Swiss-Prot record:
Subcellular location field: Secreted
Protein name, per record: Fibrinogen alpha chain
Gene Ontology cellular-component annotations: extracellular region
Subunit structure: Heterohexamer; disulfide linked. Contains 2 sets of 3 non-identical chains (alpha, beta and gamma). The 2 heterotrimers are in head to head conformation with the N-termini in a small central domain.
GO biological processes: adaptive immune response; blood coagulation; innate immune response
Its biological purpose: Cleaved by the protease thrombin to yield monomers which, together with fibrinogen beta (FGB) and fibrinogen gamma (FGG), polymerize to form an insoluble fibrin matrix. Fibrin has a major function in hemostasis as one of the primary components of blood clots. In addition, functions during the early stages of wound repair to stabilize the lesion and guide cell migration during re-epithelialization. Was originally thought to be essential for platelet aggregation, based on in vitro studies using anticoagulated blood.
Keywords: Adaptive immunity, Blood coagulation, Coiled coil, Disulfide bond, Hemostasis, Immunity, Innate immunity, Secreted
Length: 16
């Protein structure tokens, strides 16, 4: 989770 994009992708693919 480096950036916002990487964060949501790592968290749950942006479905969070």
């Amino acid at each position: 989770t480096d950036t916002k994009e990487s964060d949501f992708l790592a968290e749950g693919g942006g479905v969070r």
